[in-house]
Amino acid sequence: MQVVNVATLPGIVRASYAMPDVHWGYGFPIGGVAATDVDNDGVVSPGGVGFDISCGVRLLVGEGLDREELQPRLPAVMDRLDRAIPRGVGTAGVWRLPDRNTLQEVLTGGARFAVEQGHGVALDLERCEDGGVMTGADAAKISDRALQRGLGQIGSLGSGNHFLEVQAVDRVYDPVAAAPMGLAEGTVCVMIHTGSRGLGHQICTDHVRQMEQAMGRYGIAVPDRQLACVPVHSPDGQAYLAAMAAAANYGRANRQLLTEATRRVFADATGTPLDLLYDVSHNLAKIETHPIDGQLRSVCVHRKGATRSLPPHHHELPAELAAVGQPVLIPGTMGTASYVLAGVTGNPAFFSTAHGAGRVLSRHQAARHTSGEAIRASLAKRGIIVRGTSRRGIAEEKPEAYKDVDEVIEASHQSGLARKVARLVPLGCVKG
């Protein structure tokens, strides 16, 4: 029903799309993609982005570090990561911002500002969506409450399904694509999944309320109030996009800071550098140009729980990856595989694909008959080390709470949304 409701939004073009990991969400389904024609009454809807604005994934690749070499040191590495990575609800981050002026630099500069302040290297920005910074951000469109929530959380993982996971490449499907990505069987990687924390949540809350009140002024009626929306070109639409871009920059800076904390751990414990393969959001609305009915049109592409998947030779790709397409990073669960895919030509869903396994049990259902300690012990028997802040949080994220990620990936591959490159298996997981 949510996919059908999205299809009624003013200005929608082509279709309302559901990715293979689709499940129920706020307004839009999670795993939903829709684009609206910016110049023909197209709207923007915060429900099409979600509360965790710019939630996304980045993958770090261990330079010359093999799974067998890491294995004896893995417990020590996980203990160090446990201490180095702030996480949990309301947790303070690794970067203590001195004032709101510095926060505003983060909101407009994203990962680029973090790198300029010494938290990373220039190559990191080449491997980030939009070079690590989304243009059009305006902190003036953000409430004091949202700014206050963001001030103390930069450089923290959060809770829920957010994680930092040490992984190893288990299988390579496309050696030609895997080579420039630095992926070979046994290669150690680190996947980071988090977003814009309380700041992004508050921005969504604020602008949904504003749009609910504003829709009448634009003559808009929607079948579900959670689909509150306004024209992209309206003052309300522009205000949301400016605030959303600021949250996107916060999310990118957040992952950049966690990257540096992880690099320090690996440098100290293994002497191995970690190179960034790619960083991409899966909760975002972006103004893009796509062919619509034979003409190039400016459209607002909503991707909620959906990963951008650019094809080979797209102008936004870094030169080293242009021939193979954008790396698409799709995590599984604590006990299952994650995947690296690559974008393909001909993707009908505005170059979008799945973003994860897709939840099938609510957090309450998942935790009802399972203890976090039992899950931790079960995973330990399989050689997977879990470090969490709460037993309930681990129980809520048990592998059985999600769809079979292998099936989600196969559906993405077979339907022409992306192609499989490599399969990664978990070695250790830091959970919020």
Curated annotation (Swiss-Prot):
EC code: 6.5.1.8
Domain of life: Bacteria
Catalytic residues identified in the record: 355 (gmp-histidine intermediate)
Stored InterPro entries: RtcB, RtcB-like_sf
Positions contributing to Mn(2+) 2 binding: 55, 193, 282
Gene Ontology BP annotations: RNA repair; tRNA splicing, via endonucleolytic cleavage and ligation
Physiological role: GTP-dependent RNA ligase that is involved RNA repair. Joins RNA with 2',3'-cyclic-phosphate or 3'-phosphate ends to RNA with 5'-hydroxy ends.
Family, as annotated: Belongs to the RtcB family.
The name this protein goes by in its record: RNA-splicing ligase RtcB
